[in-house]
């Protein structure tokens, strides 16, 4: 390893070698922080420009080991006032100290090298797939699942979902699927065999896991039209998984279906709550149809209030199915409402318990057929998970008239 020699004072230095220019990182700070591929334009990378994020290329730190036991010129207290970006800079740039102060500063600098301070910062979720946030042209807004059809194996797509056709693409996700879940073989409803079993695997768990992973990867980014489209697609995925006919044939599959679907419904509810608190005008100009944007800009006496009303209608339509102006509907908004998914899952759990199709031990509080008279069905784990999603809907504070006719307000 090569070490740089200590710099000499300008008056006594005879080295005529020019100082090498400072180099900047090839990727911007935002892409490096999320571990994404950066396009590297000096004026701003494509991802930062698309997400309206500050694009800054920080300087590379000098390579090599810092010089040891370099005397300092400042007082003792400044030894401990070191920032995380320049931990060794103060030590390198110091001058000559007195003998006593130099010994104390040297001891402190050695202690910092042996036990450097730990700096905490909010954890950012790394973006596993660079094409999750694509433009409107590449979004597959017409993606939908037929009501009577089971989930097929995940195909390659150019839509808002990444390519999960290969194992390497799926394993680059920021989460690691527990080994206990990957070892469970679940049959499919497509082609039952002669012995009563099914030949292929059920893909519900894969869809749920990838859907949750995708939604979590959007959390660090500002709310945009891509967020709304992802939430609508997630609702379609939840509906297809709720209607799966394979999961109730096994207790393990049924429990995974209940827990992951309940988690997905809670994540969708929390995400819509975050959308409702976003800047209505900024989001509306990104997500609403161009004709509606022009109409609000030109004809509305108070555009700010008009955009707030549009955002309220959009969120209400996605949560409860309440009335909304068709002219301002977002693309791919033809998805089931969150409240309808909760009600459908509750009805499914009642049906599972009543028909006793899930084979499970009769444990109190488990998602199993009601076998003990002293345990209420509402206290079972599956209903408690669903109830937590209802609690999030209550935070929207929708008035009774904002619910469709025949829907019980939350």
Curated annotation (Swiss-Prot):
Residues 1-24, 353-372 are annotated as: Disordered. Gene3D superfamilies: Zn(2)-C6 fungal-type DNA-binding domain. One of its GO terms (molecular function) is zinc ion binding. Residues 358-369 have a biased composition (Polar residues). Disruption phenotype: Leads to high sensitivity to allyl alcohol, a compound indicative for potential defects in carbon catabolite repression (CCR), but does not affect growth in non-stress conditions, nor in the presence of 2-deoxyglucose (2DG), an additional indicator for defects in CCR. Also leads to sensitivity to acrolein, menadione and t-butyl hydroperoxide. Abolishes the production of gliotoxin (GT) and accumulates bisdethiobis(methylthio)-gliotoxin (BmGT). Leads to reduced expression of gliZ, gliT, gliF and gtmA in GT-inducing conditions. InterPro entries: Stress_Response_Reg, Zn2-C6_fun-type_DNA-bd_sf, Zn2Cys6_DnaBD. Keywords: DNA-binding, Nucleus, Transcription, Transcription regulation, Virulence, Zinc. One of its GO terms (cellular component) is nucleus. CDD domains: GAL4. GO terms for biological process: positive regulation of transcription by RNA polymerase II. It comes from the Eukaryota. The keyword Aminoacyl-tRNA synthetase does not apply. Coiled coil: none annotated. It is found in: Nucleus. PROSITE patterns: ZN2_CY6_FUNGAL_1, ZN2_CY6_FUNGAL_2. Residues 28-55 bind DNA. Transcription factor that is involved in protection against oxidative stress. Binds to promoter regions of the gliotoxin (GT) biosynthetic genes gliZ, gliF, gliT, gliM, gliA and gtmA. Two related but different DNA motifs (5'-TCGG-3' and 5'-CGGNCGG-3') are specifically enriched among rglT binding sites in GT-inducing conditions. Also indirectly regulates the expression of gliP, gliG, gliH and gliN. Plays a key role in resistance against exogenously-added GT and GT biosynthesis, mainly through the direct regulation of gliT. This is Transcription factor rglT. It comes from Aspergillus fumigatus (strain ATCC MYA-4609 / CBS 101355 / FGSC A1100 / Af293). The lineage of its organism: Eukaryota, Fungi, Dikarya, Ascomycota, Pezizomycotina. The gene is rglT.
């Amino acid at each position: 390893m090569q070490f740089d020699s200590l710099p000499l004072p300008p008056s006594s230095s005879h080295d005529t070698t020019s100082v090498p220019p400072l180099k900047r990182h090839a990727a911007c700070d935002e892409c490096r922080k999320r571990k994404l591929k950066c396009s590297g334009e000096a004026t701003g990378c494509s991802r930062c420009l698309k997400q309206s994020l500050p694009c800054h290329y920080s300087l590379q730190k000098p390579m090599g080991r810092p010089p040891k036991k370099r005397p300092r010129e400042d007082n003792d207290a400044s030894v401990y006032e070191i920032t995380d970006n320049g931990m060794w800079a103060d030590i390198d740039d110091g001058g000559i100290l007195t003998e006593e102060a130099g010994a104390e500063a040297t001891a402190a600098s050695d202690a910092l090298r042996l036990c450097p301070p730990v700096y905490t910062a909010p954890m950012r979720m790394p973006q596993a797939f660079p094409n999750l946030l694509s433009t409107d042209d590449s979004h597959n807004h017409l993606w939908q699942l037929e009501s009577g059809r089971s989930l097929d194996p995940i195909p390659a797509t150019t839509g808002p979902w990444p390519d999960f056709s290969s194992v390497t693409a799926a394993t680059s996700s920021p989460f690691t699927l527990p080994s206990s879940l990957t070892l469970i073989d679940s049959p499919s409803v497509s082609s039952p065999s002669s012995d009563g079993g099914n030949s292929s695997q059920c893909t519900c768990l894969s869809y749920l896991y990838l859907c949750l992973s995708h939604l979590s990867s959007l959390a660090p980014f500002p709310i945009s039209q891509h967020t709304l489209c992802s939430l609508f697609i997630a609702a379609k995925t939840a509906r297809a998984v709720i209607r799966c006919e394979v999961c109730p044939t096994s207790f393990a599959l049924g429990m995974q279906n209940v827990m992951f679907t309940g988690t997905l419904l809670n994540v969708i509810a929390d995400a819509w709550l975050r959308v409702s608190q976003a800047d209505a005008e900024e989001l509306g100009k990104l997500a609403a149809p161009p004709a509606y944007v022009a109409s609000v800009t030109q004809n509305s006496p108070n555009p700010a209030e008009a955009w707030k009303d549009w955002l309220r209608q959009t969120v209400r339509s996605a949560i409860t199915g309440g009335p909304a102006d068709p002219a301002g509907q977002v693309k791919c908004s033809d998805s089931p409402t969150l409240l309808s998914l909760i009600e459908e899952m509750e009805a499914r759990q009642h049906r599972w318990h009543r028909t006793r199709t899930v084979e499970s031990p009769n444990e109190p509080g488990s998602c199993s057929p009601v076998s003990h008279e002293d345990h209420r069905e509402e206290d079972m784990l599956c209903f408690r998970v669903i109830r937590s999603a209802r609690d999030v809907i209550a935070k929207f504070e929708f008035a009774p008239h904002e619910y469709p006719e025949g829907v019980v307000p939350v």
